[in-house]
Design a protein with these regions (language model features):
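Catalytic Walker B motif of ABC-type/P-loop ATPase nucleotide-binding domains
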Residues: 5-9, 14
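ABC transporter nucleotide-binding domain
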Residues: 22-109
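A short, proline-enriched helix->beta-strand linker immediately N-terminal to the Walker B motif
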Residues: 1-3, 32
């Protein structure tokens, strides 16, 4: 067993069954070795890593346990399905974390301590929300 294993995007291109098998293998290796996992699949980090770092352009924006980072955003992530024509307004008026097309309609996640406006529902944050919140926070500070 190696003492250190570095893997870069190891699950990219794998089908779901192979991805699960490989993640289980990495988890087992992590019991006796240090595994450094570089990935853009945040779900893999949440499921696999006891400690993580979020980096952007070579700069470390956050280190810690994934669940602790997620807990910091508790009660501050809001979701709403909007019209494509309204996206620009939401980008200007709110701290937009992400936009995802669901059945052709944009669904946005907004970071806010309070309900941004009528129609938003509070959702449980995930590591993707943490990632985008840290990127936006870093961009504002720069």
């Amino acid at each position: 067993n190696p003492k250190l294993l570095i893997v870069d995007e190891p699950t990219a291109g794998l089908d779901p069954a192979e991805r699960a098998r490989f993640l289980n293998l990495l988890s087992e290796l992590g019991e006796t070795s240090v595994v450094i996992l570089s990935t853009h699949i945040v779900e893999d980090v949440t499921d696999l890593c006891p400690t993580m770092a979020i980096m952007n352009k070579g700069k470390v924006l956050l280190t810690g346990r994934p669940m602790d980072a997620i807990a910091e955003l508790e009660s501050q992530v809001w979701r709403k399905q909007v019209e494509k024509s309204e996206l620009k307004r939401y980008e200007q008026d709110f701290t937009l974390l992400s936009t995802r097309l669901v059945a052709g309609s944009p669904v946005i996640h907004v970071f806010s301590a309070d309900r941004p406006e009528v129609g938003f529902e509070r959702v449980a944050p995930d590591l993707e929300d943490v990632y985008f919140q840290r990127l936006r926070q870093h961009a504002k500070a720069a």
